[in-house]
Amino acid sequence: MDSTATVASDRLSQLNSFEETMTGVKGLVDSGIKEVPAMFREPPAILASRKPPLALQFTIPTIDLNGGVVYYKNQDSVTRRSMVEKIGDAAEKWGFFQVVNHGIPLDVLEKVKEGIRAFHEQDAELKKRFYSRDHTRKMVYYSNLDLFTAMKASWRDTMCAYMAPDPPTSEDLPEVCGEIMMEYAKEIMNLGELIFELLSEALGLNNSNHLKDMDCSKSLVLFGQYYPPCPQPDHTLGLSKHTDFSFLTIVLQGNLGGLQVLHDKQYWIDIPPVPGALVVNLGDLLQLISNGKFISVEHRVIANRAAEPRISVPCFFSTVMRESHRVYGPIKELLSEQNPPKYRDTTISEFASMYASKEINTSALLRLEI
């Protein structure tokens, strides 16, 4: 066996041994590990973090939703138009923004973070009944979705639940956090519909329900990310660089930072947690149907340097885990001789296959370009 084959065999053996424990990265930390195992170690070029010069300090836009869904319909036309302009500008230039005054109660935000942490920190045997990579199940728990396909594993564990359009029952979810997950998902569905309305108007579409009518807000997947303290945070990542498959992602950050967005394809910009705020980013599917007007940008999470775990609750408006033959392409109303289609039409299932098989550090959208 040549050296390359030997390395590959050794790596597969490491991955299988790790998977068989069903305790994830937290299990490694609990065992008292002092060094990051080879399967997690990233090369320096991947870990590099180019920051903008001091004269060019950036922060992602923050948008005040003036109370969220409950108050939006009663906003005066000037306030509403201002919100649409701000969200459209952020979607075109950043692909990322934060929303405040969004209408979701602060106690709900705190309880869902506490629930996700409680799930990951409960007795390992209780978690193991959810450990699976079978995404036909309503709820699964694992470490690294792409454990066996990525070049390197990342320093995090994940729980994942399908909350819409076919919501789980209380029996499908963990007792320690199921109730708050369902409550939070309902709040996020309402907020997501509002954001899709604003984005529809920002695109200049006559119907503010246009994106909702395309089922962009129909499916919701809730993730509970747990980033344990890392003994060597300069040797690995919490989540490697990527774009999201989704139409839209709404992220609740915990108290610890770590999320970074690649701005202008050159500078890594930190997105520190803001109490009560939610981070919103656009996914590949929204870039596709907006014909590139709105952008899906790369982002990552650096390894956790703190002594306590980092919690994150991203919710994806996406059908990626549920096969769909619905066709999506650039919205016809946006096209003209001056703005011809940049992408060909595709089905969700075809695009999901492209996303899963794309080369490292590339976008699946490249394979749809005309």
From Swiss-Prot:
Keywords: Iron, Metal-binding, Oxidoreductase
MF-aspect GO terms: 1-aminocyclopropane-1-carboxylate oxidase activity; dioxygenase activity; metal ion binding
Residue positions binding 2-oxoglutarate: R310
The keyword Nucleus belongs to this UniProt entry's keyword annotation: no
Residues at which Fe cation binds: H242, D244, H299
Domain of life: Eukaryota
EC code(s) of this entry: 1.14.-.-
Domain Fe2OG dioxygenase: 218-320
Cofactor list: Fe(2+)
Gene3D superfamilies: B-lactam Antibiotic, Isopenicillin N Synthase, Chain
Main enzyme class: oxidoreductase
Cofactor-binding details, from the entry: Binds 1 Fe(2+) ion per subunit.
Keyword Iron: yes
Single GO biological process annotation from the record: biosynthetic process
UniProt similarity note: Belongs to the iron/ascorbate-dependent oxidoreductase family.
Name of protein: 1-aminocyclopropane-1-carboxylate oxidase homolog 8
